């Protein structure tokens, strides 16, 4: 079952909980003249997610399909969506296009350079290249500048059946999850290198009002401070 929550005006969180691993997989539909779906989900999730989208819009209205980095939970169902929605187009960064998407996708993507913006009607999105943050050479995030929503992928990942939105201690949750992952076969799923702090600081400087996280609760507290605190937590946990 997909849980649907409007976390900001016309910004919808579509959450599928994987009981086997105790983790939410969140996908975001942003309504506008040209609707954007951010995260396609796994290929196996396409039937369930597409049914959830139908509760909000006619799927064929989707114009843009985006994600952070080339990974199955991010864009595994991309070609299923492109087949179902003939007018939809992928949108991704230059590295993602050159390394993976140009070959993988059944239609070519709109390619964005670092800092480039595009509009969907009333909204303007900025692509921010964030190599290896959270992970992947091609990683990037999308910042919706109109309402200041940061679609931040795996940053702040935390486990469990959690509320759709919180203004509580999201960094504490993320730190606990990082520490647990470090004790598992999935250790260092997020790296920390000499550029990580600078990248997280640049995201904090965007002054987002909402962090739309892929795994766990979205956050509407002090987002800039949360990003800076996440840098500290990641550095302390991942560089021991």
What do the PLM-derived regions correspond to, one by one?
Residues 38-40, 62-70, 89-94, 150-154, ...:
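Active-site neighborhood of phospho(di)ester-bond hydrolases with catalytic His/Asp-centered motifs
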Residues 6-9, 88-213, 217-224, 232-234:
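Metallo-beta-lactamase
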Residues 85-88, 220-240:
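Short acidic, glycine/proline-enriched helix-loop-strand junctions
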Residues 42-43, 72, 157, 218:
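Short, glycine/acidic-enriched loop or turn micro-motifs at the edges of active sites
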Residues 13-19, 41-43, 67-69, 126-132, ...:
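Short, flexible loop segments at the rims of nucleotide/cofactor-binding pockets, characterized by
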Residues 2-54, 141-152:
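Conserved beta-strand hairpin/beta-sheet module of binuclear metal-dependent hydrolase folds
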Residues 45-91:
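Active-site metal-binding motif and surrounding structural segment of the metallo-beta-lactamase
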């Amino acid at each position: 079952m997909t849980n649907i929550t409007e976390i900001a005006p016309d910004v919808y969180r579509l959450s599928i909980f994987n009981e086997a691993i105790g983790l939410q997989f969140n996908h975001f539909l942003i309504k506008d003249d040209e609707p954007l779906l951010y995260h396609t989900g796994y290929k196996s999730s396409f039937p369930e997610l597409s049914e959830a989208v139908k509760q909000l819009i006619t799927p064929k209205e989707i114009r843009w399909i985006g994600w952070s980095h080339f990974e199955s939970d991010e864009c595994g169902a991309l070609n299923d969506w492109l087949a179902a929605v003939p007018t939809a187009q992928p949108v991704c960064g230059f590295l993602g296009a050159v390394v993976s998407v140009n070959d993988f996708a059944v239609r070519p993507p709109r390619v964005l350079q670092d800092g480039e913006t595009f509009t969907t009607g009333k909204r303007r999105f900025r692509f921010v290249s964030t190599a290896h943050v959270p992970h992947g050479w091609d990683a990037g995030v999308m910042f919706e500048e109109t309402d200041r929503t940061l679609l931040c992928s795996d940053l702040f990942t935390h486990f469990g059946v959690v509320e759709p939105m919180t203004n509580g201690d999201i960094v504490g949750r993320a730190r606990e999850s990082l520490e647990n992952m470090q004790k598992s076969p999935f250790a260092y799923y997020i790296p920390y290198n000499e550029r990580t702090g600078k990248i997280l600081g640049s995201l904090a400087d965007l002054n987002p009002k909402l962090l739309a996280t892929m795994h766990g609760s979205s956050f509407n507290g002090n987002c800039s401070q949360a990003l800076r605190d996440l840098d500290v937590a990641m550095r302390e946990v991942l560089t021991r």
